Amino acid sequence: MTTLAIDIGGTKLAAALIGADGQIRDRRELPTPASQTPQALRDALSALVSPLQAHAQRVAIASTGIIRDGSLLALNPHNLGGLLHFPLVKTLEQLTNLPTIAINDAQAAAWAEYQALDGDITDMVFITVSTGVGGGVVSGGKLRTGPGGLAGHIGHTLADPHGPVCGCGRTGCVEAIASGRGIATAAQGELAGANAKTIFTRAGQGDEQAQQLIHRSARTLARLIADIKATTDCQCVVVGGSVGLAEGYLALVETYLAQEPAAFHVDLLAAHYRHDAGLLGAALLAQGEKL
């Protein structure tokens, strides 16, 4: 059975056909609509899936935000155009006439990345550092989503009580500091208004402020990982996302994690499926019908 997998992120929408063998084909991307309206997202999703839907028997969605009862609740509305209570499952069922499931994108990615690990690992955490910071937890060989879909939203844990206000409404969240948006927001002077990709480029060219911003992000993530080790005793942490997979970033995180007491050290791995983990994880979960 072929799954039409969809990944809804803060900057892009992706879709692909995924067979029972896990092979990804006919992958397509569109920018996430800048307009803060449900109709804009519906129209973009329609354009994305229309060339693919005839070749699939079901739909699996991985989306940023909390997924509850098939609807999207954007914990940080800034990451998805201010959408709240968007009926993801209902919308895709109407567009495709196919049975549909939905799950948080980082939770989906965690499940895909777990499948790529050695068989003796039963407990792992996936962290995505991209437009925002998200995560997924596998414990005892099972994906933990929680009764309300909140499990794994580790980007909204405290990093600095005196830090910037996060889009979720809390102060000093990891996401507000370590994410691509957090890096860009903190930029000043000639870097003001630059996005995270530009800041990474400037850091590689020796720009001191850019390097400091990236170190701040990596240090914040390392402290989060130490906290995760303390709370889950996971065997490894897998890091993905456009920031997490940026050249040199994971090595910086490892350097800062090494400064923590040894009890909080844990193996860090780069995401095996890189930017396709959400798509694949959603398809795998649809195959297992575990949602």
Swiss-Prot record:
Top-level taxonomic group: Bacteria
Family to which the UniProt record says this protein belongs: Belongs to the ROK (NagC/XylR) family. NanK subfamily.
An example Gene Ontology biological process: N-acetylneuraminate catabolic process
Subunit structure: Homodimer.
EC number: 2.7.1.60
NCBIfam families: NactlManKinNanK, PRK05082.1
Residues that coordinate or bind Zn(2+): 156, 166, 168, 173
Gene: nanK
Pathway in which the depicted protein is active: Amino-sugar metabolism; N-acetylneuraminate degradation; D-fructose 6-phosphate from N-acetylneuraminate: step 2/5
Top EC class of this enzyme: transferase
Record-given protein name: N-acetylmannosamine kinase
Binding site for ATP: 5-12, 132-139
